[in-house]
Amino acid sequence: MPAILIVDDNPIQAVTRRLILEKAHFPVVLADGAPAALARFESGEPFGMVITDHCMPEMGGPELVKKLRALSTTLPIVVLSGLPEAESEYEGMDIYFRLKPIHPQELIELSRTLLFPPYCQIA
């Protein structure tokens, strides 16, 4: 299973999310900011999805998402923010926006849904 890349400049937030997802048996890789995340992608490391913070120094969530979309149009990307108005900055970028704090079970279920989408069955 490809890993989930968590991008957050706050190590406490990043490690907390990693522990939640690892307990649910997801492989997780951390990046301490957008430049580190892009470097991992450009090296060819395979990821099944990205969970990123909105507000980060050097490069914020919207710029990171634009760069990730240039590399992959189908990669599931979840953006977390404490600012409800931030969602408008991602219009047309095909992301999943969630407000912080996100409940651990919601994070697990969202990850499961995005990594293992349900298939249509013909009755």
Where are these regions (language model features)?
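C-terminal output helix
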Residues: 102-115, 119-122
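Short acidic/polar segment at the start of the alpha1 helix of CheY-like receiver
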Residues: 10-14
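Short amphipathic alpha-helix used as the core "switch/output" element in two-component signaling
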Residues: 39, 62-73
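Helix N-cap/capping motif at the beta->alpha junctions
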Residues: 30-39, 61
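Receiver (REC) domain active-site loop signature in two-component systems and cognate sites
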Residues: 56
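Charged docking surfaces used in two-component/phosphorelay signaling
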Residues: 15-23
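Hydrophobic/aromatic residues positioned on beta-strands within the core alpha/beta folds
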Residues: 80-81
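Active-site residues of response regulator receiver
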Residues: 53
